[in-house]
Amino acid sequence: MTTEELYDKLKLIQKMKCETQNLELKSAEQGYPKRLYDSLSSFSNQDDGGIIVFGIDEKQDYKEVGVYDAQDIQKKINEQCLQMNPVVRPLITVVEKENKKFVSAEIPGIDLADRPCYYQGRGRLKGSYTRIGDSDEPMTEYEIYSYEAYRRKYQDDIREVPRVTLMSLDQEELNRYVELLKRGKRRLATLDNESIYELMSIKRGEKVTLSATLLFSPYPQAYFPQLCITAIVIPGRTIGSLGDMGERFSDNQRIEGTIPEMLDEALLFVKRNMRTKTIISPTTGRRTDRTDYPITAVREAIINALVHRDYSIHTEGMPIQLIMFEDRIEIHNPGGLYGRITIDQLGKIQPDTRNPVLASALETLGITENRYSGIPTIRMEMEKYNLRQPEFLDERGSFIVKLYKESKNDYEDMSNDEETNNLIVFCKTPRTRKEICDYLGLNS
């Protein structure tokens, strides 16, 4: 940044009096900070990078104390950056204000294929960090694996399942799938079934793949008990709410079977637990039945979870969660977003596919289109129902879809309240409790 930009940043810090997702503050009045590699790592591992400002003391109400030696700090910043893998290349700026010197180090986000950036002195597993609000948190083993899986193009949907044999699969369903594969594919139609099994990743060598197990096994959960859907209905708006009889769940079901079977059962669960209104048109007198949520949107959200969840060994113990609250439906999908796509880009660009073989097989079976139309369809269906637009959240190791029962007009009326709207914008960046309390002028 330029010196003018750093002066502006110092003014903003005095106004906000907090660190943020992209800002770390260090005093450095009495000497160089004991550790910096956690911030170097976490900023490098996010798209927008981050800025470290030296000369601000949080413990003295963000007082501008200045640094002990601007020249030495620059040298030590560079030394620590060289100890990172990949090496971090900071952009350093120095300014003087009221006879005190302040130093900033801009840390650029590195390419997704090069992540995680970690401190070599602690190794990849212990030296990799991610930024959560104003905190640098150690990456989980799964978060580190997810970067490696993308970089090396792991295909967990076709990993081998040792206990499953070809003959243990549902032969009728398997044969139907092979016949569907052959339609319109002249060259494929000339091959024998054994060749097709290998070519289309139904098996690898003598081992059946995970995709084939999830699609054609009579009972996939015999091998992977948690590759299922846990569906619950909460009698309130938060988990922990109790019903009139003290019940925690109004309905509770473990949904198992093949992927097509789980999709059908999940839809039945949702239909069973939402209201259907009967509307009589005042002009035509015709009757129309209207459910709380558009079924097409619910179906797309569930099939997206089943197709795009992470199927690696790190998440095979985590089921998809389908939670129906009083005011919304939430679908929690193990794995988070895959590849380079961000939340803001969902439905606008073609994403990387985490499970390409599984997605292609479900397209052949007529379960999904595999044309990246799921998110736009969900949004369009909610719009048709005049409901609030869905929310998509990418949290640590989890992707969440929220479908709201609230009408679009009611939500927009609330959103037009300037104070509420400003708070929503402020919280789009992950914030700590202290940041939110400071913003609202409350005691933490």
Q: Where are the model-predicted features located?
A:
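Short alpha-helical segments that sit at the start of domains
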Residues: 405-430
